[in-house]
Amino acid sequence: MTQDYEVEFVERGEREARILVRGITPAFANGIRRAMVADVPTFSIDTVRVIENTSVMFNEQIGLRLGLVPLTTDLDDFEIGDEVTLSLSVDGPSTAYSSDLVSSDPMVEAADDNIPIIDLKEGQRLEVEADAVLDTGREHAKHQGGVAVGYRHLQQVEVVGDLGEFEDDDPNILRGVIEEQAAEHAAGDATNGELVATDEFDNDLRNRYPGKDVEVSDVPNAFVFHVETDGSFTTEELVLRAVETLRDRATELKDAVQL
């Protein structure tokens, strides 16, 4: 029997998104999270050849900083193990930024232009060549395109009554996304069934349902993923590629069992 899943973007951006997935177990949700962190490859500088470095920083420190610069990655045109050469040449007084990296392939360049590498004083110079390799976060953390990936249950809020005149009115903090089921009690315009990020009401249910006593429950088999990338690719690309890796491994296991 084929399992049907429902996927919906709660918030959708190039580098940050919230995605609701229904019809999955907690184990499957964690598998998706792990795949986004460890199985989707990105380019990262791996080998650095220092031609000249008269700065105050050791060559090894320069190499470490370069290795952490996110690089744009087009997974349709490269395979794991492919390499691209970059170079950097800056004279002081000046600050060397990620934008100073010159790539041999226009498809692989710094994802952000304003990442400082080192501040060079008068008479100082930095010139290096570097090889960026395509690999996964399973091999090294610098290849993790999903820099902040987490999930939590979708939640529902039920109004069970009114707060008494002398009842405690302390903040009732909830973080995540709720599926509105008490629109008639919500402040402002609300519709039952809509998805609402809790930061829209400062994560305080008292702001959403003033004067009401509420109970919070998890929606079974429904999870909201918060996904943030380092700019190597979009959040949508990260999610799709992660799911592809899970599918490929499941197919590989199925074929092995049938031998």
From Swiss-Prot:
Catalytic reaction equation(s): RNA(n) + a ribonucleoside 5'-triphosphate = RNA(n+1) + diphosphate
Location of the protein in the cell: Cytoplasm
Sorted UniProt keywords: Cytoplasm, DNA-directed RNA polymerase, Nucleotidyltransferase, Transcription, Transferase
Gene Ontology molecular function: DNA binding; DNA-directed RNA polymerase activity; protein dimerization activity
Pfam families the record matches: RNA_pol_A_bac, RNA_pol_L
Enzyme class at the top of the EC tree: transferase
An example Gene Ontology CC term for this record: cytoplasm
UniProt keyword Transcription present: yes
Its EC number(s): 2.7.7.6
InterPro entries: DNA-dir_RNA_pol_30-40kDasu_CS (IPR001514), DNA-dir_RNA_pol_insert (IPR011262), DNA-dir_RNA_pol_RpoA/D/Rpb3 (IPR011263), RBP11-like (IPR036603), RNAP_Rpo3/Rpb3/RPAC1 (IPR022842), RNApol_insert_sf (IPR036643), Rpo3/RPB3_RNA_Pol_subunit (IPR050518)
Domain of life, per lineage: Archaea
Annotated GO biological process: DNA-templated transcription
Function of the protein: DNA-dependent RNA polymerase (RNAP) catalyzes the transcription of DNA into RNA using the four ribonucleoside triphosphates as substrates.
Family assignment from sequence similarity: Belongs to the archaeal Rpo3/eukaryotic RPB3 RNA polymerase subunit family.
Summary of subunit composition and partner proteins: Part of the RNA polymerase complex.
Protein name: DNA-directed RNA polymerase subunit Rpo3
Organism: Haloarcula marismortui (strain ATCC 43049 / DSM 3752 / JCM 8966 / VKM B-1809)
